């Protein structure tokens, strides 16, 4: 990243742009120090960046930064509510093991299913395009796979 782009990114981050905050923290992590990078990462999460929220939850969960399991759970829940696909899987883990919440297998299953759907929606598109390409309207196996992810 050239100096001009770096300065523009920093100014955007300082003005409150949550996406710029996350991008700036990733830049700092690569080329400067982790402490300042994490400060900007936390700001991005608090400013509503879903990806930063999910990552912040993982930082806490794995002990890379201080925080409680309840805080990690809240980050995962908020990120999943904003549509961050990875957060659904992390939230499922919290429900499965009771990390930061009451253990709930049904909610864990729902989260994993949502995570699976997000992860595999490309597969659904590929299956549909393959059926169109081959002209297979009644292919039971492809229909079963597609239905699993819907």
PLM regions and their residue ranges:
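Alpha-helical adaptor scaffolds
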Residues: 26, 43-46, 50-81, 86
């Amino acid at each position: 990243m050239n100096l001009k782009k770096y300065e523009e990114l920093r100014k955007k981050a300082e003005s409150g742009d949550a996406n710029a905050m996350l991008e700036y923290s990733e830049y700092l992590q690569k080329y400067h120090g982790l402490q300042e990078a994490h400060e900007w990462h936390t700001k991005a999460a608090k400013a509503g960046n879903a990806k930063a929220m999910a990552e912040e939850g993982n930082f806490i969960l794995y002990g890379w930064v201080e925080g409680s399991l309840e805080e990690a759970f809240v980050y995962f829940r908020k990120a999943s509510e904003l549509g961050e696909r990875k957060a659904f899987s992390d939230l499922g883990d919290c429900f499965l093991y009771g990390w930061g919440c009451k253990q709930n297998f049904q909610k864990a299953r729902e989260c994993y299913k949502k995570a699976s759907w997000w992860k595999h929606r490309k597969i659904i598109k590929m299956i549909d395009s393959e059926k169109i390409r081959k002209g297979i309207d009644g292919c039971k196996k492809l229909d079963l796979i597609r239905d699993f992810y819907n």
